[in-house]
């Protein structure tokens, strides 16, 4: 937090609400540079960008299961969609996750096996009611942006898609000189999905790690109720471990929203759905980078990349106009 404040990268004071960071120009530049860098890479890897709303009617959260199983971590409110004379109150929920929006986008179209895999990504801001004692600067906030993506694919495509995601993880982590380790969390006692689905999904995650020559630990019974997952934990410059990337198989949402695709035999099947985040929370990753580099970010990611010392006042306007025209961020 001291590094963030002293370098003018962010405001994590409580006047705007606990866990709701503000970003002045320098901090916003770093966030945008991270997003643009990842966006170019994702386009090259066959992802398509989407934008989804911050709020949904509560019916969406009831269908997804969040209303019953995650409501203590959500923000709900009512608005009058009628008139003063004939009020009609409608409850909405602020999104804690981007998944339902991507699922609704998938459901809005008819899909063939030829369309799969479909890779949708978004830099989506989410809000979670974390306990005030658990909030910690940028590393654990109540409002944060995730580099969320959801891959809709066939059962036979799962391994290849997870391998591709792990390749992306490796590229990102090596760019920032992070060492990292993987952990596969398996089926908990309470879960949905058949034994066959869980076995296939868990084996797919293991096979993907093996094909990527990525060692992993097994965290027995710590998967989500809707599917197994791979967690990527990074080590910073002084050896501290941070949770970042996640690859999650989701049996829940395709079932709840009744997603389908048309097979080569002209029958309907449920797609498999992979949730993945590379940075995780961009704010959290930003905070980890600041800690990792002790505030001295790589040049390409630095909020100010050029500083000019004018010899005379008349040089200021000329220098400013010329460099701004070339989209150069500078201090004069």
PLM feature segments, named:
Residues 1, 5-7, 96-151, 155-172, ...:
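Conserved alpha/beta core surface patches that mediate binding of polyanionic ligands
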Residues 79, 83, 174-247:
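Metal-assisted phosphate- and nucleotidyl-transfer catalytic regions
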Residues 11-138, 221-223, 229-246, 254:
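Class II aminoacyl-tRNA synthetase-like tRNA-binding/catalytic domains
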Residues 16, 143, 176-178, 224-226, ...:
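Short flexible coil/turn linkers enriched for glycine and charged/polar residues
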Residues 5, 48-53, 176-181, 216-219, ...:
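Flexible, glycine/charged-enriched surface loops at secondary-structure junctions
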Residues 296-324, 330:
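Generic long, charged, amphipathic alpha-helical segments
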Residues 2-9, 13, 322-325, 329-332:
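Single conserved hydrophobic/aromatic residue that forms the stacking wall/gate
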């Amino acid at each position: 937090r001291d590094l963030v404040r002293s370098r003018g990268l962010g405001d994590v004071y409580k006047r705007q609400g606990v866990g709701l960071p503000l970003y002045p120009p320098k901090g916003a530049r770093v966030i945008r540079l991270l997003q643009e860098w990842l966006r170019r890479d994702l386009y090259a890897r066959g992802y398509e960008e989407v934008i989804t709303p911050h709020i949904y009617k509560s019916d969406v959260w009831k269908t997804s299961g969040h209303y019953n199983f995650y409501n203590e971590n959500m923000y709900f409110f009512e608005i009058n969609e009628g008139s003063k004379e004939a009020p009609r109150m409608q409850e909405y929920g602020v999104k804690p996750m981007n998944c339902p929006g991507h699922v609704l986008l998938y459901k809005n179209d008819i899909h063939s096996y030829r369309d799969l895999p479909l890779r949708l990504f978004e830099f989506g801001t989410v809000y979670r009611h974390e306990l005030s004692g658990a909030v910690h600067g940028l590393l654990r906030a109540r409002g944060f942006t995730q580099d969320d993506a959801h891959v809709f694919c066939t059962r036979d495509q799962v391994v290849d898609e997870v391998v591709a995601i792990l390749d992306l993880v490796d590229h990102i982590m090596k760019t920032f000189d992070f060492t990292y380790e993987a952990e596969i969390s398996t089926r908990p006692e309470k879960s949905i999905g058949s034994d066959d689905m869980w076995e296939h999904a868990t084996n797919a995650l293991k096979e993907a790690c093996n094909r990527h020559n990525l060692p992993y630990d097994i965290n027995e019974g710590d998967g989500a109720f809707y599917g197994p997952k791979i967690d990527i934990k990074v080590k910073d410059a002084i050896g501290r471990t941070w949770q970042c990337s996640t690859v999650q198989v989701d049996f829940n949402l395709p079932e709840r929203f009744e997603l389908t695709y048309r097979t080569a035999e002209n029958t309907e099947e449920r797609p498999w759905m992979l949730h993945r985040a590379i940075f995780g929370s961009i704010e959290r990753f930003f905070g980890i980078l600041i800690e990792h580099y002790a505030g001295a970010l790589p040049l390409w990611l630095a909020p100010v990349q050029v500083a000019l010392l004018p010899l005379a006042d008349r040089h200021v306007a000329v220098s400013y106009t010329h460099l701004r025209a070339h989209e150069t961020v500078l201090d004069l």
